[in-house]
Amino acid sequence: MSSAVVVGAGVFGAATARELALRGWDVTLVEQYAPGTVRSASGGDTRLLRFAHGDVDWYAAMAREARLKWIELQEATGTHIWEPIGLAWFARSEDGFEARSRASLDRLGIANEWLQPEAARSLYPSVNVDDLAGVLYEPEAGVLHARRATQLLVEDGEQAGVIYESARVLPADDPHGDVVIWACGPWLASLFPTLVDLKVTRRDVFFFGADGSWRGTPGFCDYESAHYGHGEIAGLGVKVAPDLPGDEVDPDTLERIPLPAWERMAREYLGNRFPSLADAPVIGTRVCQYDLSADTHFIVDRHPERDSWWLIGGGSGHGFKHGPAFAEYVADCVEGKREREPFHALGPRAGDAGLRTGSYG
């Protein structure tokens, strides 16, 4: 039996450890804090699962696979982690990100619908569509309960044989395994500074109080204004997150207190897009972080000097939803069943693949 040590129990590490165990590997999963910790890029209450990624089919196809795997995990464990509420992209033009995404979804046979602005009024109790050219609607998209889903991957992995250990592991510790997978999220670049180029930036998220009419409304993304969120879920409130460039931070020492400027941005967007919520109170906040690669593609590659070590990460603010499908891809690469994609290689990155939920040009 082959052995693996997976360092990091965020969604990438937890899912990969579980996947390898299901394939018969002897797996140890090591985490310095706790699965689902707010310090990780996987920490938080909810994450959108959407298929649209511009014209990059690879991620759309993986999101489709991941959705099925999340639902299978939910059904197998009897633990609720998936909200099938759909998702709307608010399009400012007919030939932008949403149009490129629609072409990709059509190529892959993923359900989508282009709505005229007025038709989108039926999706929400209150919505301003005056600035929209249309709405790209993804009926099979939804929201994951992120922290619980991460913890569930660890728990289900343990049922499959994963040994979970609480410890801080560094490259100098030279962990023992036929394969060592470093899935360290926002810590990956600090562990391998000459190999990994990631920016770790803060992201302030706000939840606003709303009445029951907002329960179960679709998630939303606004690419041009770089905001995303969802309606009322599980008593959390209506989520609004500005997806704009944030300050670089240290995930170990960051004081997770939201900044007033970010609240102003979120509230301004909320009042403009959903007018009936203009005066809604803030009932919850989160401060998390992204681990951003230069082009927003993930990292999956061997260490150039340690052939048995793999570095995976660079979720770049769009990685969580892919969890179990990404783990299958990583496990295939580790087992030599599949070549890693060229755009996941270590080394310099150029440009922006436009895989996040906002335009920054």
Question: What is the meaning of each model-derived region?
Answer:
Residues 144-213:
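Predominantly flavin-linked oxidoreductase catalytic cores and closely associated redox partners
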Residues 18-23, 80-83, 184-305:
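Active-site substrate-recognition segment that forms the wall
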Residues 2-29:
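N-terminal Rossmann-like FAD-binding beta1-loop-alpha1 element of flavoenzymes
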Residues 72, 92-160, 165-166, 292:
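Flavin (FAD/FMN) cofactor-binding and adjacent substrate-gating region
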Residues 46-123, 226:
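Dinucleotide-binding Rossmann-like beta1-alpha1 core, especially the glycine-rich loop
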Residues 275-361:
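C-terminal catalytic lobe of FAD-dependent flavoproteins
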Residues 22-42:
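Glycine-rich FAD pyrophosphate-binding loop
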Residues 5-7, 30, 176-187, 327:
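Short hydrophobic core segments
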